[in-house]
Structures are given as structure tokens and as C-alpha cells.
Amino acid sequence: GNVTMPWGSTPKGWVKFMEERPYFSGSFMWTGFDYHGETNPFYHSNVSSSFGTIDICGMEKPPFYYYKSWWTDGVVLKLTPHWNFRKGDKVTVAVFTNCEEITLLLNGKKIETRKIEKYDQALFTLDFEPGVLEVVGTKNGNTYTDKLETSGKTSSVTVTEIEPITKSGDIAIYE
């Protein structure tokens, strides 16, 4: 028969649920990808769901790395979301990993080292400071890194029309 998780379950809840049932041969997660329609809980001007672990453009969202760190033997070490804020902002970043231990550094200065337990993600809240935010992880004696860098000022943007509008109602395409 069907065994289901309640609607709105967290990735952590889902992973634990699966792990406790070794007799399962697989699972299905609704939804893996964002899709057009069902804009709940947002309605006005939204055109797609935001529940997937991969967005509508095919880019991985943070929960993707949580699941990946659970189901793969390969190393997963992902620092999210980005490092472009205002100086002094309080920012929470997440590290999704299957490393045994991680160290967070800001501009080369150690912020904190943590042991990572199964099913956990590491959350850090710190004051934004422009530069490089880096996480160093260790697994089986090997060291891995991921980093986020503050971007500089945009100097220019170039847009090129590759398919012009030929009749009313058409869509122009740019790159």
C-alpha cells in the first residue's frame, strides 16, 4: 500500500522517514521541479509553484543539496544562498553537507567549527562584511571547500535581440 508523508513535510522529516523504512525500494517526492500553476500560498502575479528542489530554469535550490547529501556517497558541501548584502546586515547562511566537520571563514578569519550529525544542516547567523565567505569541510581525512564572494559593481549590461517581434502579440527574444 501507499505510505505517505504529510503535506508540507520538511526535507529532514522526509529523509528520516525514508531512513527508518529500509524495506522501501524507493520514493516519490512531489515536487522535484517547480512548475507552472498552483502558486499557493502566493497568488497575485505569480505563475509557478515554488515547492520543487529544482527551479523552473533547472537550477538546484538549497533543499536539493540536503537531499543529495543524504543519498550520495560522493562529497556534498554547499554554502547558500549568496554573499551580496549591506554592510552590517544580519545574514543567515546554510551549509548542506555530508562532511563530518565544517569550518566557516569570513575573509580568512575563522567564525566557527562544527561537527555535522546525520540529517543536519548547519545554519550560521553573522554580520555581513563584503569579501569571501568560505566553508571548509572534512570527510574521510580529505578537505573540501565551497565559497561565496561579494560581487563588484556592474559596469555594463549588454542585451542583444536574437529574435525580433514580427507581429502584434509576438515575443522578442534577447540574450
Task: Identify the residue ranges that each predicted region occupies.
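A short, polar/proline- and glycine-enriched secondary-structure boundary/capping micro-motif
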Residues: 115-117, 157-158
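Short S/T/G/P-enriched beta-strand
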Residues: 72-92, 148-175
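Extended substrate-binding grooves/exosites of carbohydrate-active enzymes
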Residues: 1-115, 121-128, 132-142
